[in-house]
């Protein structure tokens, strides 16, 4: 089920940060263009996209994550601290020209309609979790698995993808995967 999310969204490109649905991302905003972006959306629908810039050029990966501001605090020195809660992934269709300091893009959410259903992962989840636990143990990573079990399947998958000790390019591939079958994390476990 895709809700009526905007087809034109402002984009916050941030290298080294891959952001997933059903996860939270704290951000410290200090550049004027992104202060403008956050102020504009906070007074509107609170929705913005996070996208990974590609290396060595001014383009972006085609898949990012739509998030909603769920916490907003201004500091005395003009910075804004926000928490962004991931909603769904999107695919960039094209840039929309504007007179703003930040970029806006026309996006499509259809490919990622399973972001709204944790039950779509049920069949493969048991095998995936065994492989994920082995992967984390093998890499010396500690995780409170009892607490982790309280998350829904979508949150589990996306949280593991965010915190896994893999490259940003590998995380981007995980973000672009449409279903658990295409995730790739079990292949590296």
Residue ranges and their predicted role:
Residues 1-189:
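N-terminal low-complexity, acidic/polar interaction/targeting segments
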